[in-house]
């Protein structure tokens, strides 16, 4: 039996032998198309080639493209697990011709692949063509020898493909496999076409027209070919299955899920196993391609998929995280074809574990609430949109998760009500924002750009320039003039000032002009991409529209910012080399006094790893190698090994910054990144690099803080001063501070143990002599002062043993707070409840409740001064 890996290799090898370039799958996040959530077909990475905006060094290509359909226009999430052929993740095999061959050769290749390479019987195949595409019908007859009755003309738009409202378009031809009369269903175009007998396996798109304004269409000068064949569907046919989930790759994941959960893969939880198998693939590949769970955009779609799988794990009785345990099974199945999966395995595993652990408590509470609400519904009633929104807003339940849970009970959600609740929340948020005054000012920047255009940036080559004031904004509105004392936003026709973007803070400096004009600039922002807004205060003179001015950037501050920005590039590459290529930038700040760099990394970065990274960056600084910048197309940059931020939209030309001597074959520099910021001339200009902190930002994201140059020297000097001061206090040499502190800590530990032992003996000694009676019951009530709260329970148990029968109430006032423990001997728990007594004590010290068992409970409160009142409250409660 041909495995999925065999099928993929056979397909690609055939087209490689026939003059096609084998192109790697693009990442699931489109490199240069923020309008598309995820790559959902093989042609996405070639979109600009088809439209003529990009040229490649080949005119024929073949790929096995990773695809995700979840969220947005193409969303299969709700159906996954319940049907034989819906997936959030799938692979699309395809061959492409960019103005090279057309219909005849495309049909020839397709027929050769399905009948010769894969050995499908010709009598089991039929095709569809667009109703007017006589050429395709004729070619299928002559090349494949198909009779007329197995060439079906389709009049619907299903067999005519368009890239958009305008642009390349053309008829399609689809190849179908016939499973035979024992399977229900009719041929395409028939009333029973949705049955499983006839399955589409390959779609050939003949791009031969250019769609213009409505009603206009012209022939393309260079017709092209775009084809797509789902690997999972083809595998089902070749492996003799009617269900994609029974094919080798997905079945292996289902079996792994069954082994981990102890649930029969084909039993009552069959659907849940299928959901877990599919969602494991989509979540893992998305994370391997740089997407991490969050509450917005692509990250939120990823989180929705994860949480749907987590609910199905819950349905199978899993009380511990499941998905992360299945990652090795996925890597075994698909790691050979997709190396990025292997490289990101630790990131995927840890992120899944963290997400599952954190969502578990919310899932339990949310499902309990959902169960309560459903219990209030009558037969056939839908769940209100307000309740569904509360589940979303409070417990993190995406709407589709709630719908999925109700679907199993034959119920639905009032989606319109949910949407209304969501709209109302957004309306309130907008109202709060617009009330701040920011909204009113945003419109000004659109008006400025429409009226006078953007600003030309000169800051890569100079820090000083002549310019003209083209717009002034004061108090949120356009103005013609700005006198001395005015807080003003100045827009110039050109500027050397860098506007805050890409993590680099904006420049500061001075604008001067005729008649004593002097404006102190405290910040520079970039609006709408190319409107540079200089924020400052008119110190003297009168600023006017059309006025010629001289602008000068604060050189010392800019130099410090440049050093920090260049250091982040070296840091990024050093982290990837030390921790793995799963490390990707998730955010940054490059300021004059520090840098902050957020990266995808599932676990804390160890002190040893940080030391290695810091040393490597400093070695690169000492190289004093030149920092080079070049302009090229995004595709050229990526081909050279430049790192780009997935999901960012880049123009036709990008700025590529490279630095450091190369250490990797085929890569011309140590670090190569797409970057629009300002940088040092040589790595030596950074001076010194020092990591100051490492912490968590969110699940799967770590933050590194560091300083460079003079800021690093200042910090080292401060650390040295503190070390000398500490050594002086300890009366040892600086080199002996660590040994002396360790010795003191050990001495303290021994003294604390001795003190606790003395307090324990003091508290329990002579218990019988210090016992009072309340209603004929013995009570040992004591204020123990600074005794550690953690000691109270053990002391209460010891005193209770001495009493044999009675109640113990102990209060500690350590650390300025009251801690209370109440114990009741077993023979009295039918008369006195320790929880009730401790809650009375808690109220006296300003606490809110308390908890425990009938024989032992504890509580606390902020008012340590009322410790004796707490003991009296216990007496009163016993006497009541």
Swiss-Prot record:
Principal location class: cytoplasm
Keyword Zinc: yes
EC numbers, comma separated: 6.1.1.7
Cofactor binding description: Binds 1 zinc ion per subunit.
Origin superkingdom: Bacteria
Cofactor(s) demanded: Zn(2+)
GO cellular component, one term: cytosol
A GO term for molecular function: zinc ion binding
Cellular compartments annotated: Cytoplasm
Example of a GO biological process term: negative regulation of DNA-templated transcription
Catalytic function, reaction form: tRNA(Ala) + L-alanine + ATP = L-alanyl-tRNA(Ala) + AMP + diphosphate
Xref: InterPro entries: aa-tRNA-synth_II/BPL/LPL (IPR045864), Ala-tRNA-lgiase_IIc (IPR002318), Ala-tRNA-ligase_IIc_anticod-bd (IPR018162), Ala-tRNA-synth_IIc_core (IPR018165), Ala-tRNA-synth_IIc_N (IPR018164), Ala-tRNA_ligase (IPR050058), Ala_tRNA_ligase_euk/bac (IPR023033), DHHA1_dom (IPR003156)
Residues annotated for Zn(2+) binding in this entry: 565, 569, 675, 679
Keywords from the UniProt entry: Aminoacyl-tRNA synthetase, ATP-binding, Cytoplasm, Ligase, Metal-binding, Nucleotide-binding, Protein biosynthesis, RNA-binding, tRNA-binding, Zinc
Family assignment from sequence similarity: Belongs to the class-II aminoacyl-tRNA synthetase family.
Job of this protein: Catalyzes the attachment of alanine to tRNA(Ala) in a two-step reaction: alanine is first activated by ATP to form Ala-AMP and then transferred to the acceptor end of tRNA(Ala). Also edits incorrectly charged Ser-tRNA(Ala) and Gly-tRNA(Ala) via its editing domain.
Classification via HAMAP family: Ala_tRNA_synth_B
Domain comment, as recorded: Consists of three domains; the N-terminal catalytic domain, the editing domain and the C-terminal C-Ala domain. The editing domain removes incorrectly charged amino acids, while the C-Ala domain, along with tRNA(Ala), serves as a bridge to cooperatively bring together the editing and aminoacylation centers thus stimulating deacylation of misacylated tRNAs.
Protein's UniProt name: Alanine--tRNA ligase
Species this protein is from: Granulibacter bethesdensis (strain ATCC BAA-1260 / CGDNIH1)
């Amino acid at each position: 039996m041909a495995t999925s890996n065999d099928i993929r290799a056979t397909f690609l090898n055939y087209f490689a032998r026939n003059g096609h370039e084998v192109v790697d799958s693009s990442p699931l996040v489109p490199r240069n198309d923020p309008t598309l959530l995820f790559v959902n077909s093989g042609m996405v990475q070639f979109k600009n080639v088809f439209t003529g905006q990009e040229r490649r060094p080949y005119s024929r290509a073949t790929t096995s493209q990773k695809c995700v359909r979840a969220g947005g226009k193409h969303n299969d999430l709700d159906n996954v697990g319940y049907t034989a052929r819906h997936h959030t993740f799938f692979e699309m095999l395809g061959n492409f011709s960019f103005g090279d061959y057309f219909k005849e050769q495309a049909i020839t290749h397709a027929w050769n692949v399905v009948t010769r390479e894969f050995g499908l019987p010709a009598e089991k195949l039929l095709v569809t063509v667009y109703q007017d595409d006589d050429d395709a019908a004729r070619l299928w007859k002559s090349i494949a020898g198909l009779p007329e009755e197995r060439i079906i003309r389709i009049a619907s738009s299903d067999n005519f493909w368009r890239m958009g409202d305008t642009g390349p378009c053309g008829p399609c031809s689809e190849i179908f496999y016939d499973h035979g009369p024992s399977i229900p269903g009719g041929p395409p175009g028939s009333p029973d076409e949705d049955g499983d007998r006839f399955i589409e396996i390959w779609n050939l798109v003949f791009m031969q027209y250019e769609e213009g304004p409505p009603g206009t269409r012209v022939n393309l000068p260079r017709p092209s070919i775009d084809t797509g064949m789902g690997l999972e569907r083809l595998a089902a046919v070749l492996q003799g299955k009617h269900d994609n989930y029974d094919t080798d790759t997905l079945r292996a994941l289902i079996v792994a899920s069954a082994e981990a959960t102890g649930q029969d893969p084909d039993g009552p939880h069959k659907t849940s196993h299928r959901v877990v198998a599919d969602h494991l693939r989509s979540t893992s590949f998305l994370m391997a391609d740089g997407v991490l769970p969050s509450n917005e955009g692509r990250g939120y779609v990823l989180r929705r998929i994860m949480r749907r799988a987590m609910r199905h794990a819950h349905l199978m009785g899993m009380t511990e995280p499941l998905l992360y345990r299945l990652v090795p099974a996925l890597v075994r199945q698909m790691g050979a074809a997709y190396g990025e999966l292997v490289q990101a395995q630790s990131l995927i595993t840890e992120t899944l574990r963290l997400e599952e652990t954190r969502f578990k408590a919310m899932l339990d509470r949310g499902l309990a609430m959902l169960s309560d609400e459903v219990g209030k519904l009558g037969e056939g009633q839908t769940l209100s949109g307000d309740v569904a929104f509360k589940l979303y807003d409070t417990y993190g339940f995406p709407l589709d998760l709630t719908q999925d849970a109700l679907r199993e009970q034959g119920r639905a959600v009032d989606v319109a009500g949910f949407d209304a609740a969501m709209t109302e929340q957004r309306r309130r948020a907008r109202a709060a924002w617009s009330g701040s005054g920011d909204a009113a000012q945003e419109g000004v920047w659109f008006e400025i750009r429409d009226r006078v255009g953007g600003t030309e940036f000169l800051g890569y080559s100079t820090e000083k320039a002549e310019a003209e004031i083209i717009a002034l904004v004061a108090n949120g509105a356009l103005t013609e003039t700005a006198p001395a004392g005015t807080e003003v936003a100045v827009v110039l026709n050109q500027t050397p000032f860098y506007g805050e973007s890409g993590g680099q803070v904006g420049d500061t400096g001075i604008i001067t002009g005729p008649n004593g004009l002097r404006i102190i600039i405290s910040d520079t922002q970039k609006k709408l991409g190319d409107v540079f807004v200089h924020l400052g205060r008119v110190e003297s003179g009168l600023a006017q529209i059309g006025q010629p001015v001289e602008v000068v950037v604060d050189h010392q501050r800019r130099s410090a910012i440049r050093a920090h920005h260049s250091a982040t590039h070296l840091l990024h590459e050093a982290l990837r080399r030390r921790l793995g290529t799963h490390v990707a930038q998730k955010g940054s700040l490059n300021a004059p006094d520090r840098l902050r760099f957020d990266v995808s990394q599932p676990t804390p970065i160890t002190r040893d790893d940080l030391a290695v990274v810091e040393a490597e960056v400093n070695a690169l600084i000492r190289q004093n190698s030149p920092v080079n910048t070049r302009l090229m197309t995004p595709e050229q940059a990526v081909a050279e090994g430049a790192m780009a931020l997935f999901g960012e939209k880049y123009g036709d030309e990008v700025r590529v910054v490279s630095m450091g001597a190369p250490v990797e074959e085929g890569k011309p520099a140590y670090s190569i990144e797409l970057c629009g910021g300002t940088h040092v001339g040589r790595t030596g200009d950074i001076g010194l690099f020092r990591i100051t902190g490492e912490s968590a930002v969110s699940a799967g994201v770590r933050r590194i803080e560091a300083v460079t140059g003079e800021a690093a020297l200042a910090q080292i000097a401060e650390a040295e001063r503190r070390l000398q001061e500490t050594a002086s206090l300890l009366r040892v040499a600086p080199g002996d501070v660590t040994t002396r502190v360790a010795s003191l800590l050990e001495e303290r530990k021994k003294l604390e143990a001795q003190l606790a032992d003395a307090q324990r003996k003091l508290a329990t000694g002579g218990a019988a002599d210090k016992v009072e009676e309340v209603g004929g019951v013995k009570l040992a009530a004591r204020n123990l002062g600074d005794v550690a709260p953690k000691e109270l329970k053990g002391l209460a148990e010891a005193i209770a043993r001495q009493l044999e029968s009675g109640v113990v109430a102990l209060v500690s006032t350590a650390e300025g707070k009251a801690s209370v423990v109440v114990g009741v001997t077993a023979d009295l728990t039918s008369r006195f409840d320790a929880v009730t007594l401790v809650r009375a004590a808690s109220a006296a010290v300003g606490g809110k409740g308390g908890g425990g068992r009938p024989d032992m409970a504890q509580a606390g409160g902020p008012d340590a001064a009322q410790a004796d009142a707490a003991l009296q409250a216990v007496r009163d409660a016993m006497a009541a």
